[in-house]
Every structure is written in structure tokens, then in C-alpha cells.
Swiss-Prot record:
Record's protein name: Potassium channel toxin alpha-KTx 27.2
GO cellular component, one term: extracellular region
Signal peptide (UniProt feature, chain positions): 1-17
Gene3D superfamilies in alphabetical order: Knottin, scorpion toxin-like
InterPro entries reported for this sequence: Scorpion_toxin-like_sf
Chief location: secreted
Family, as annotated: Belongs to the short scorpion toxin superfamily. Potassium channel inhibitor family. Alpha-KTx 27 subfamily.
UniProt feature coiled coil, ranges: none
Record keywords: Disulfide bond, Secreted, Signal
Tissue: Expressed by the venom gland.
């Protein structure tokens, strides 16, 4: 029973990821071709937990307006 609660809490923690559309991604993003520090993710990419969602062969980072 304790294992089931632990598994439930782990799934819950992963499912509460903060998703922001076209938000700044600071904090050492290494999944993009160029880091998205002080830049924004281009649409339709999203910023999930400080990282832009990235696809192979696409530049997802844009210069931030602030």
C-alpha cells in the first residue's frame, strides 16, 4: 500500500509540470541548438520547467523582447 502511495505521489509530481507558452527559458537549457537563456521559445514550442520543447532540425529560440 505504501508503494502505491509513493508511486501516486511521483506521478502527481511529474504531472504538475509548469507549462508556459512563449515564455522565457532561463537556467541553462541544453536541449536546444542554442541555449534559450534570456530568450523565448518560438511558437508552437512551449517552455516546460525552464526548458523549451525542442524538435530536431528546428531553431526554437528567439531573442527576448525584454
Amino acid at each position: 500500500m505504501k508503494l502505491m502511495w509513493l508511486l501516486f505521489l511521483c506521478v502527481l509530481a511529474f504531472s504538475i509540470a509548469q507549462i508556459y507558452i512563449n515564455d522565457t527559458c532561463a537556467g541553462g537549457v541544453h536541449r536546444c541548438y542554442e541555449p534559450c537563456e534570456k530568450k523565448k521559445c518560438r511558437l508552437p514550442h512551449k517552455c516546460i520547467n525552464g526548458r523549451c520543447t525542442c524538435y530536431v532540425g528546428r531553431n526554437v529560440c528567439a531573442i527576448s523582447s525584454h
